[in-house]
A protein has these predicted regions:
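Active-site-adjacent beta->alpha loops and helix N-cap segments on the catalytic face
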Residues: 3, 74, 100-104, 120
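N-terminal amphipathic alpha-helix/helix-capping segment at the start of soluble metabolic enzymes
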Residues: 1-21, 32, 78, 82
C-alpha cells in the first residue's frame, strides 16, 4: 500500500472511534513501526522532527543546521522510508513534527510528506 495523506488516517480514526499512534523516528526505526502496525493491521503515522533532519543532513550540531543541511537530511530520510511505506500492507502517513519554519515545511512537502506541523 502506498503512502496515504495523514488526514485520511485521522478521519477514519475519528469516524470509527480509535486512536492512531504517531512515532518520531530517525532512520531504520521506521521499519519497526511499520512492521508492528502490519501485525496489528492498523494504520501508522511516521514522523520526523526538524532537528533530526539537520542530523541526517550531516550536522553534528543539529540544532543549528543550515537550510542546505536540512534539505539534504529530509531527502535522505525520504529515500530511506518511502520504499518501506510503499511496501507496507497498511496505510502509512509521513509527517513533519515540531517544524520551526515554512521553508522546512515546504522542503518536506516537496519530498513527499503528506502533512507538516509547525509549532517549534
Amino acid at each position: 500500500m502506498a503512502q496515504v495523506p495523514m488526514i485520511n488516517i485521522l478521519e477514519a480514526a475519528l469516524r470509527h472511534g480509535y486512536a492512531v499512534g504517531a512515532f518520531n523516528v530517525h532512520t531504520h526505526e521506521a521499519a519497526a513501526v511499520i512492521r508492528i502496525h502490519e501485525q496489528l493491521r492498523a494504520p501508522a503515522i511516521i514522523q520526523l522532527i526538524q532537528p533530526s533532519a539537520g542530523f541526517m543532513g550531516g550536522r553534528a550540531d543539529f540544532m543549528n543546521a543550515t537550510p542546505e543541511e536540512m534539505c539534504c537530511g529530509i531527502s535522505r530520510f525520504c529515500r530511506l522510508v518511502q520504499p518501506m511505506m510503499e511496501q507496507a500492507s497498511v496505510p502509512v502517513a509521513l509527517n513533519l513534527d515540531h517544524g520551526n519554519d515554512p521553508e522546512t515545511a515546504k522542503i518536506c512537502v516537496d519530498n513527499g510528506f503528506s502533512a507538516v506541523m509547525i509549532d517549534g
